């Protein structure tokens, strides 16, 4: 019996250790990156960015039927189990309104990235429809290649270029559109130097030396922004007020618990009717997302009834 990973959502497909033999059958290129831990167990060389990408490719193919997936060099290669957790907890939040998880939810992914990870998981697990926004032209092109390369996804995922790098919802949510939820993995560093320091810490934790290759890729807009995570989410909160009748739940990951108090104050200032925090855990890593709405319980029920 393989050991379970602590803390993952009950519906997460990644509770058990990876079956590397099966994953290598699905994605043969993964085999060249297998290694042994000091305890003699087979593992993946997580210090190698090509190994991490091959693992992601295998996980997406095996668990989510994404046959064709790739990202350009230098873009974030996200851990699939943690991204899946956000989707499952979001599903629970949407299900609280009517007592059932909606099968046809419409979700906006802010900053979908070159990897398009949240829409890929959400479409497979729940049949939702996604709009992915992205400011980076190369990331948008990469995500479109993934969508076009997998039959069926073009009907479920559409992409929009955010032409104003200072905006989040403005220019993306159109006048008569409605979304059950938004989600976002915001840039969390406040400078390029801070982002580099974070990568150094991760590298040391993996036992890499300073000159080793990084698997912690990421373009500037993926890793940092002026003012860091708090400033980014405050902008999101400020913009959300104008779309409070078009979106039922606004949500975003928050990397550090100490960032919550100023965000809660900002939500009070814009008149959010309800604010929810969802705690998550992937192995030793603790994470969370916050959700807010400008609709009361009755308004949310009517919103979902109208959309259906």
Swiss-Prot record:
Reaction equations catalysed: adenosine(1618) in 23S rRNA + S-adenosyl-L-methionine = N(6)-methyladenosine(1618) in 23S rRNA + S-adenosyl-L-homocysteine + H(+)
Enzyme Commission designation: 2.1.1.181
Membrane-spanning intervals of the chain: none
Keywords (A to Z) from UniProt: Cytoplasm, Methyltransferase, rRNA processing, S-adenosyl-L-methionine, Transferase
InterPro entries xref list: METTL16/RlmF, rRNA_lsu_MeTfrase_F, SAM-dependent_MTases_sf
GO MF annotations in UniProt: 23S rRNA (adenine(1618)-N(6))-methyltransferase activity
Class of this enzyme: transferase
A GO CC annotation given for this chain: cytoplasm
Subcellular location field: Cytoplasm
GO biological process terms held by the UniProt record: rRNA base methylation
Region (Disordered): 190-212
Function comment: Specifically methylates the adenine in position 1618 of 23S rRNA.
PANTHER family attached to this UniProt entry: RNA N6-ADENOSINE-METHYLTRANSFERASE METTL16 (PTHR13393:SF0), SAM-DEPENDENT METHYLTRANSFERASE (PTHR13393)
Designated name of the protein: Ribosomal RNA large subunit methyltransferase F
Gene: rlmF
């Amino acid at each position: 019996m393989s050991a379970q990973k602590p803390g993952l959502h009950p519906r997460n497909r990644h509770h058990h250790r990876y079956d590397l033999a099966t994953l290598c059958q699905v994605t043969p290129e993964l085999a060249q990156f297998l290694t042994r831990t000091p305890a003699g167990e087979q593992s993946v060389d997580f210090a190698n960015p090509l190994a991490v990408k091959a693992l992601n490719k295998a996980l997406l193919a095996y668990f989510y039927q994404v046959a064709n997936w790739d990202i350009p060099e230098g873009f974030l290669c996200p851990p699939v189990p943690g991204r899946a957790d956000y989707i499952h907890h979001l599903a629970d939040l949407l299900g609280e309104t009517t007592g059932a998880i909606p099968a046809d939810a419409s979700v906006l992914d802010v900053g979908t990235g070159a990897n398009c990870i949240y829409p890929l998981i959400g479409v497979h697990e729940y049949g939702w429809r996604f709009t992915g926004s992205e400011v980076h032209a190369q990331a948008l092109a990469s995500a479109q290649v993934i969508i076009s390369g997998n039959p069926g996804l073009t009907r479920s995922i559409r992409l929009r270029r955010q032409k104003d790098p200072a905006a989040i919802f403005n220019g993306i949510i159109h006048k008569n559109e409605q979304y059950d939820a938004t989600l976002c993995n915001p840039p969390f560093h406040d400078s390029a130097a801070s982002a580099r320091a974070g990568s150094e810490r991760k590298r040391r934790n993996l036992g890499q030396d300073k000159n080793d290759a990084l698997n912690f890729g990421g373009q500037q807009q993926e890793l940092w922004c002026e003012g860091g995570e708090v400033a980014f989410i405050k902008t999101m909160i400020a913009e959300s007020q104008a779309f409070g009748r078009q979106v039922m739940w606004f949500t975003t990951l928050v990397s550090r618990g100490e960032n919550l108090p100023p965000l809660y104050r900002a939500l009070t200032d814009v008149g959010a009717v309800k604010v929810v925090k969802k705690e998550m855990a992937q192995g030793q890593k603790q994470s969370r997302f916050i959700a807010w709405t400008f609709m009361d319980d009755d308004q949310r029920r009517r919103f979902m009834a109208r959309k259906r």
